[in-house]
């Protein structure tokens, strides 16, 4: 399966762009969705997290209390290492499986922290959704109802714009964000990826 990874910083519009590829019939695998699924009630990973951190990280309804876990991990680097060692292999395995099971000519793999977690090798091609920092801050504040300072803290913890662009095979400028502006570029990329996927399939 030919895999195109799509990444970008917070507020860049990754989900919106991925949805437009989905409308073209392309299977989309989202790392964030998988990350939530592997810690659902009944999942072995959730039991391991509860055993390691204690019952405080489990909410009354049996779901993972993400805020409580975030606070524990934020203040304890060793805890973050342990958690990543547990979850990242599970998420990666599930991403591989879903990409392999895709039925479209190529698969779109949405990984927000592709560069940060050094996962560019998972894909045949990397598409970076690029916007400037001011746009990221404005969109995220409006979408999530958070302060500029909170968004800036998230940005500081993510790869820089330059680091993401250095990892890109293709770049989609999404500063405007208007569908009519983006659609022609998406269609052009789609045709390119279809051709690459066809070429790969013919070599198998």
Swiss-Prot record:
Classification via InterPro entries: Depp_CoAkinase (IPR001977), P-loop_NTPase (IPR027417)
GO MF: ATP binding; dephospho-CoA kinase activity
Domain (DPCK): residue spans on this chain: 3-200
Binding site for ATP: 11-16
A GO term from the CC aspect: cytoplasm
Localization per record: Cytoplasm
PANTHER family cross-referenced by the UniProt entry: BIFUNCTIONAL COENZYME A SYNTHASE-RELATED, DEPHOSPHO-COA KINASE-RELATED
The protein, known as: Dephospho-CoA kinase
The organism's taxonomic lineage, starting at the top: Bacteria, Pseudomonadati, Pseudomonadota, Gammaproteobacteria, Aeromonadales
Gene assigned in the entry: coaE
